[in-house]
Amino acid sequence: MIYEGKAITVKALESGIVELKFDLKGESVNKFNRLTLNELRQAVDAIRADASVKGVIVSSGKDVFIVGADITEFVDNFKLPEAELVAGNLEANRIFNAFEDLEVPTVAAINGIALGGGLEMCLAADYRVMSTSARIGLPEVKLGIYPGFGGTVRLPRLIGSDNAIEWIAAGKENRAEDALKVGAVDAVVAPELLLAGALDLIKRAISGELDYKAKRQPKLEKLKLNAIEQMMAFETAKGFVAGQAGPNYPAPVEAIKSIQKAANFGRDKALEVEAAGFAKLAKTSVAESLIGLFLNDQELKRKAKAHDEIAHDVKQAAVLGAGIMGGGIAYQSAVKGTPILMKDIREEAIQLGLNEASKLLGNRVEKGRLTPAKMAEALNAIRPTLSYGDFANVDIVVEAVVENPKVKQAVLAEVEGQVKDDAILASNTSTISINLLAKALKRPENFVGMHFFNPVHMMPLVEVIRGEKSSDVAVATTVAYAKKMGKNPIVVNDCPGFLVNRVLFPYFGGFAKLVSAGVDFVRIDKVMEKFGWPMGPAYLMDVVGIDTGHHGRDVMAEGFPDRMKDERRSAVDALYESNRLGQKNGKGFYAYETDKRGKPKKVFDATVLDVLKPIVFEQREVTDEDIINWMMVPLCLETVRCLEDGIVETAAEADMGLVYGIGFPPFRGGALRYIDSIGVAEFVALADQYADLGPLYHPTAKLREMAKNGQRFFN
């Protein structure tokens, strides 16, 4: 053994060839934390000191290669002064450079996922051989930063600036065949041939058949582009990427600027450019929010995994109520491998559900994400039925009938008598109390809520609602099924609106107040879209459905009359009474035309102004900042109340629910992280400025206490 640490070992393989293996003890994956970086330095020193070494193969003892840096260390590291961040990155790069500068050839054997620092380690090697099942990429832009271990320097010098910009700015994982095509790897082999492939390359390099020094040289030099080529490549890319990323996500464009600035430098000077740009991005609020989001997501996955121990295996599912929603649920279950019965009392509803599932599967085939054979397999896994004949072996039933408590209670009581005693019943409801629905059941311990968001195939969140009598097994089984469907489940306790809708309706309440104060709804939409929402509140209401919003508003007002009940008519009342129901009937706040692709396109319709005129009670002058605060303060305060009331267990789950469920701007991190970014004391003072707007704007006593004590939601 040439070197042995807790993360890295170096041992002889054969005839002067050694294996530098990453295998971080006590972890399921390899990652570049402080320990691993320090051991890499020591391992490289040990190799350099051993005259018998003729070549190095870099490998992994895990199923993955290296997943990247240890993101948990970013939180503290990024609080350091910018100059210290630059120094830290340059120190790390000295280690990578020392490996790259070894006087012997090096080959990276990529067995699994190699992301971020993992790929940057591979780029420092002379050759890369990749398993057909592996994936590589530089996803740092998704964290609001860009590669900091040489990725912006080595990758463009290996695969060309255009390809490198595409890889770095998109941040996606790349398949082996795509990596080979652009020259990011030198060979692709079957998983069982990976070591043999690496040995073949290293032996050919040792023998002189391959000139490893010539292969290494371009990574040490400036980019081979003249001034005109640079201008065309970089200026065009910056314009395109800026349009794609938008103004709230600076990292992709900053990565291009770094590559451009370093284009005329050799490796060492280019790495200084990279380190300076990386440190600048690391200090932004966008990076802080996106890293927080990543850590929240990891926390969600850990919590969901904890349910696996007691969850029952779902081998056969069923959905009650076909149509668009039922068809979407059936599609999601079938395409992820769980056969599902789709029951309705009407043949036309069954056909609608099958058409929806077939359309979604066909779209995946068209995009190359599914083979025709897999599409047929998924369609065969959806069994339509008008009766309960095959329900005896169903493990979970998702009830997705009309949003009416009496109808739901009747359907749930009926199906309970048709399934086995331990089958789970789950109601896909957005507003109706799970405890209320449970009263109709003989086995309420087997009953939970399972709230899907529309459209089911696109929205990642599922709220699993625990009722007073829901058993841990029922909750765990539903969480496991949601995960199996490819969703991100969050367990919440029962209350009107649960988490997401309870928080969303105060946001709509702020919007209603603005419209009643004479503020143009088109202006409100533009301001909130600029703030970062995927669509403004008026457009969102149209997409959700004015009738749905009207019903939900009434449910929330009944549940929380002290702050959500408003005796005055609102914009939603006016539209609902005028049968302007949104996209579903072609007119709401906006009117809707069909574009060339058959999708609804919103257009301004002046007739809506006459509809809204009776509910405008004043003409108040407000700034764009006021608009944001009228909307965001009640949303944030309701999120605080959900956490305080125990509706959601952690701040991480609350924030992720809003990001996944209603498109809360990811670069702002979620409602509670947004409060943190302002400062809790500052947010309380801000809310107090709008106290005259009503109880939705009044901070809780506990939040005031947090402000007084200088506390945060995330430390």
Swiss-Prot record:
SUPFAM superfamilies reported in the protein's UniProt record: 6-phosphogluconate dehydrogenase C-terminal domain-like (SSF48179), ClpP/crotonase (SSF52096), NAD(P)-binding Rossmann-fold domains (SSF51735)
Span of the signal peptide: none
Single annotated GO MF: NAD+ binding
Gene3D superfamilies the UniProt entry points to: 1.10.1040.50, 2-enoyl-CoA Hydratase, Chain A, domain 1, NAD(P)-binding Rossmann-like Domain
Binding site for substrate: 297, 501, 660
Catalytic activity: a (3S)-3-hydroxyacyl-CoA + NAD(+) = a 3-oxoacyl-CoA + NADH + H(+); a (3S)-3-hydroxyacyl-CoA = a (2E)-enoyl-CoA + H2O; a 4-saturated-(3S)-3-hydroxyacyl-CoA = a (3E)-enoyl-CoA + H2O; (3S)-3-hydroxybutanoyl-CoA = (3R)-3-hydroxybutanoyl-CoA
Region feature Enoyl-CoA hydratase/isomerase, mapped onto this chain: 1-190
Pathway(s) served: Lipid metabolism; fatty acid beta-oxidation
Region (3-hydroxyacyl-CoA dehydrogenase): 312-715
Annotated positions binding NAD(+): 325, 344, 401-403, 408, 430, 454
InterPro entries associated with the record: 3-OHacyl-CoA_DH_CS (IPR006180), 3-OHacyl-CoA_DH_NAD-bd (IPR006176), 3HC_DH_C (IPR006108), 6-PGluconate_DH-like_C_sf (IPR008927), ClpP/crotonase-like_dom_sf (IPR029045), Enoyl-CoA_hyd/isom_CS (IPR018376), Enoyl-CoA_hydra/iso (IPR001753), FA_oxidation_alpha_subunit (IPR050136)
Subunit structure: Heterotetramer of two alpha chains (FadB) and two beta chains (FadA).
Entry function: Involved in the aerobic and anaerobic degradation of long-chain fatty acids via beta-oxidation cycle. Catalyzes the formation of 3-oxoacyl-CoA from enoyl-CoA via L-3-hydroxyacyl-CoA. It can also use D-3-hydroxyacyl-CoA and cis-3-enoyl-CoA as substrate.
UniProt xrefs under NCBIfam families: FadB, PRK11730.1
Name listed for the protein in its UniProt record: Fatty acid oxidation complex subunit alpha
Biological classification of the source: Bacteria, Pseudomonadati, Pseudomonadota, Gammaproteobacteria, Pseudomonadales
Gene, per the UniProt record: fadB
